Structure formats: C-alpha cells, structure tokens
Amino acid sequence: MYGLLMALAMLFMAGLCACSAQSSAAETAPQTIVVGIDVFDPYSYLDRNGQFAGIDVGLATEAFSRLGYTPEFRTISWPDKDNLLSDGTINCIWSCFSMNGRETKYQWAGPYMYSRQVVAVRADSDIQSLSDLAGKRIGVQATTKAESLFLGEISSLLPEVKQVNSFETTEDMFAALRKGYVDAVAGHEALVAKLTNLDESSYRVLAESPYSSELGVAFAKDTHEDLAVQLTQTLEDMKQDGTIGRVAEKFGLDAEKTVWGEQGK
C-alpha cells in the first residue's frame, strides 16, 4: 500500500513539473505581431526566394526581437491600411511611412530614420547646389513626392525651374538625363542610389536634399501605448549602437543623414 501511495505521489509531482515547464515555455515564447507592409524596394519587398526583405523588414525583425516579439509580415493594399489597423487584421504599419502631417492620426513609435528626396546630375554638370537648378529642366517619376515638390504642390525652398518632365519609371528618367533631355533628376534617395551606383562615374548626387521626412511605425490611435513607448526606446538604442546606420548603408543610403538628418549627429 505504501509503495502504491509513493508511486501515485511521484506521478502527481511529475505532472506538476510538466505543467510548470509548459507554462514557463509559454511565458517565454516570443509573441507574434502582425506588421503591414507595402511593396516598396528597398524598404520592404519579396526577394528572389519569395522571402520578405529590405530595410524596414530587417529593422522590424531586429527591434521586435529585442522586445520579445516575432514579426509576421503581411503585404497590404495601401489604401486599406487604416481599416486593417482598426479591425485588427494588422497590428502596425512599418513600410517607409512618413510621420509628417500625420502626427495625431496614429499611435507612433519613432521616428527611426529620415526619408530623403535627392537630386542627381551628370558627373560633368555645372549644377552644384539646389539653387543652380533655377531655369533648368528637371526629370521626375510621375505621381511621386519629387514630382509634387517641383510642381510646387509641396512647400519648399526650391528655385523656379524651366520645365518639369514626368516619366513612368526611374529608368526612363535616368535615360533622359543620360541623353541630355533633362539637366537633373529627382527622386527618393533609395531609388536614385540604386541607379547611380550602377554607374558611379556618370552621375553625381547633390549634397543638399530638397525635402526629408521622418519615418515611424504606426499603430491604431489610442492603442499599444506601452509597446509604442518601448519600441521608440529600442529604435533609439539601435540608432545609437549603429544598427540602423549599418542597415541603411547596406542599401546604398547615406547612413549619417538617413539616421540623424541633414544636420548629422
């Protein structure tokens, strides 16, 4: 009888230990957070193996890992982003999303870097600064921030140019620059860098940026307040320890200006 009681006691204790181990594992397992992204190379895109890649994908993976989360990336229809946030289909938007003008619309984490518009010219051009663009022919990609800037739809200190030529693709835009149909081209730094890096001896990017905006991670307004604060601090840590700069540089961006802005650190 005593032996039977001992055996039952041991089985009971083993069961308690197993439950405790399972509970502990559940508590330490990373939580999943659903991140909505747009396809915008080099910030967020699918690589040749069909895996999510890019600046924001790398930063989100690292930042959430430091906080004990595993990000689940989900491509979204950009016009539907607010509805997807509000109904909980996604937990946040992390996809080269500008905070400027939207400061009170979302619960933000960040800013974590700057998104810059830049101007590129031919290597032998006499254009050295933005002021030299006065009276020049400018090439831009249609429906982009650069087009709005040079058409005067966004306030800036740009001089009055002679002509704004809008092209369907950045490749067409650079072809026009190469052939001399335009004097300069403007666009997002990442897209311009991708093409100028293919032939560095033929092009030059002006040091001045005509426009920059702060990028952040957007949660639905009045939600995830604690997580947004924690993520903001983690992103600041990643700026300070050089993580964000290294990722930006890997994709051809000016690490100093991308992380710290035009004035630098």
Please tell me what each predicted stretch does.
Residues 26-96, 166, 230, 241, ...:
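Extracytoplasmic small-molecule ligand-binding "clamshell" domains
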Residues 39-40, 48-51, 97-99, 122-126, ...:
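Short coil/turn segments
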Residues 46, 60-69, 146-167, 196-200, ...:
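Ligand-binding cleft/hinge of the Venus flytrap
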Residues 57-66, 127, 131-137, 142-145, ...:
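Extended ligand-binding regions for polar small-molecule ligands
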